Amino acid sequence: MNMKYIYDKNTVVFTAVTDYDLQRTFNCGQCFRWDFKDEKWQGFAGEYPCRIWMEKDDMYVQCLSPVENFDRFGSYMYHYLGLDMDYIRLKKQFSADETMKKAIEYAPGIRVLNQPFFETLLTFIISRNNNIPRIKKIVDAMAVTYGTKVGDMYAFPTPSQLKDVTVEQYNELRMGFRSKYIYDAVEKILSGEVDENSLKEMDYTAAQKYIMQIKGVGPKVADCVLLFSCEKYESFPKDVWINRALAQLFPDGLPDCIKGMEGIAQQYIFHYARFNLEK
């Protein structure tokens, strides 16, 4: 889709944005650094501390730090927010299946974000056997302790900022058993044993196997990282809600109409399952 936007001071305004639900997108479990404050969403998108809100069909993205290159900022946020994906076409395609149509109609404005790889990897390792409020608390503590302060906020730490952090120091952030996995992930990233660019060039099957060489990264965490930061849209993360959905809604398997875009469809299925299926 073509990018349509205007600039207003430190704010980029994406125009003609239809069917975008910020609340469900930021609260559906794919990201952990966004909070709703004063009727706006505030958090980090990569290096940019932002406030985001909607006014009718216009999306306002205000950067809370000075922007040196507005074209770069606008392009980054357009992709980060998934505005470059044709959801009108995808939802029409998915709706060829009646169950998918019902799931889409329940929450049509959910989007998949395109997040930074390193942050996504570490936050989903932290998400193992965890709940969202606790994940956010640990991730925020990690940013405050090791990240760069930008205004009144803290960016997620880079690999180099974590190079000397020990397992014991991660434990102090209440990571528990995940501390050794975070340590291993940072080590493998810094050494080049796991390389983001190489990962993104692989097909889905090879990429999943490649990233699972990191300790503590099983199929679910791998699929979340591949979907939310590597544009592997065929990735289909499975948790208890998705497994219930597969059993109750798709006993004969997923429909052909979502093939190749299973990860996008997964977000509609996941949200519908959480609020409509029996436990």
Regions from the PLM with identified roles:
Residues 1-279:
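HhH-family (HhH-GPD) DNA N-glycosylase catalytic core used in base-excision repair
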